[in-house]
């Protein structure tokens, strides 16, 4: 009870908060989002509309508390403090569900639960799948007087975490490392570091296993499991090859800034591809890759190639060569995403657009 009282007396401090495209609206809300996606700040923003005596906020991942003991004592503490109308639980894991059930029987106006796991589930809760910042949200953190080229450079340097948007560029990698170390077991972190070598490329679990087994005792099954767990935590996404489900999957980070936090090796082209993927992922639609196209979204009849520095004429030449492939796939639009170039053409009803990322990301 003393620990719960200490938490109650120390509510979350006000944080610099800018409205997201997501908001808490349901009385019972389960927020699911990756490490650094802004779950905590979304909760803090919601709670800021209430007096501190009206809510209790608990981070079950806090090293200073015993989560099981906290959940066991929580129903009685809330009964003793009827002025508490809102309960916010951060860093929830499914293993806590049984001890959390008695809490849900209490008559509170709001239950807000946040988890980094996509498979988290609570009966009767509305689910809010919180993505990292997209480009439009990111630039809202900055003055409108800043030119688009500078904003795009900031985006590439800072990544998609709301916390990263506020810190100096040189501190982004260190802050992300701290967040990853505090959230991931050693094996998952080791696998994630190896994933940095496969950014925007076909990932080989065998290669990751071969590298790791020389330094630690690990099985191939454990590597598969760790990679699956990282995907479940929205740390990475694995993209299938179209019509070839057994082919190697292509790996992307859900926050492209993870690459610079995990590796000193720079590869602008691959990081640019990853940045484009992150903008597409917000649609929550099936995304594929093909031999010719970086991304293919069948539902939108859209194919995308990433050409950061190719001028429009070169892209149009490639478009002519790819026209038959586009037609066979039923694609009516090819977009070539660039750093600064632009242009447009069409052949037999299929449109080809060359667009700078900063304009494209605000228009999709």
Write out the residue ranges for each language-model feature.
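A cross-kingdom feature that marks ATP-driven nucleic-acid transaction machinery
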Residues: 34-36, 41, 242, 249-364
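Hydrophobic anchor at the beta1->P-loop junction of P-loop NTPases
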Residues: 31
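N-terminal pre-Walker A segment at the start of P-loop NTPase domains
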Residues: 1-24
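Short glycine-rich substrate-engagement loop in P-loop NTPases that contacts/grips substrate
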Residues: 53-82
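Interdomain motor-coupling "hinge/lid" segment immediately C-terminal to the ATP-binding subdomain
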Residues: 108, 115-201, 206
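Hydrophobic positions on the alpha1 helix immediately C-terminal to the Walker A/P-loop
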Residues: 42, 46
């Amino acid at each position: 009870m003393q620990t719960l009282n200490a938490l109650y007396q120390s509510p979350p401090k006000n944080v610099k908060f800018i409205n997201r495209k997501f908001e808490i609206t349901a009385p019972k809300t389960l927020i699911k989002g990756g490490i650094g996606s802004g779950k905590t700040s979304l909760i803090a923003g919601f709670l800021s509309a209430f007096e501190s005596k009206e809510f209790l906020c608990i981070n079950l991942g806090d090293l200073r508390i015993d989560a099981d003991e906290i959940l066991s004592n929580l129903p009685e503490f809330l009964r003793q403090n009827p002025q508490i109308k809102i309960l916010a639980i951060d860093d929830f894991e499914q293993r806590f569900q049984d001890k959390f059930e008695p809490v849900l029987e209490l008559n509170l106006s709001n239950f807000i639960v946040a988890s980094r796991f996509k498979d988290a589930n609570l009966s009767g809760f509305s689910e809010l799948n919180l993505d990292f910042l997209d480009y439009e949200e990111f630039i809202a953190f900055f003055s409108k007087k800043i030119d688009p080229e500078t904003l795009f450079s900031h985006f590439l340097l800072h990544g998609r975490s709301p916390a990263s948007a506020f810190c100096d560029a040189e501190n982004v990698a260190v802050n992300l490392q701290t967040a990853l170390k505090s959230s991931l077991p050693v094996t998952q972190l080791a696998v994630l570091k190896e994933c940095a070598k496969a950014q925007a490329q076909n990932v080989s679990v065998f290669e990751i296993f071969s590298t790791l087994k020389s330094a630690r005792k690990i099985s191939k099954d454990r590597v598969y499991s760790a990679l699956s767990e990282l995907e479940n935590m929205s740390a990475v996404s694995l993209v299938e090859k179209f019509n070839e489900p057994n082919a190697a999957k292509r790996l992307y980070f859900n926050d492209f800034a993870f690459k610079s936090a995990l590796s000193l090796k720079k590869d602008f082209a691959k990081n640019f591809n990853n940045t484009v993927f992150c903008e597409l992922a917000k649609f929550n639609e099936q995304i594929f890759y093909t031999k010719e196209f970086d991304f293919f979204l069948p539902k939108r009849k859209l194919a995308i190639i990433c050409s950061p520095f190719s001028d429009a004429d070169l892209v149009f030449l490639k478009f002519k060569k790819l026209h038959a492939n586009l037609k066979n796939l039923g694609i009516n639009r090819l977009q070539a995403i660039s750093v600064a170039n632009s242009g447009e053409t069409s052949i037999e009803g299929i449109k080809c657009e060359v667009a700078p990322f900063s304009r494209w990301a605000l228009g999709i």
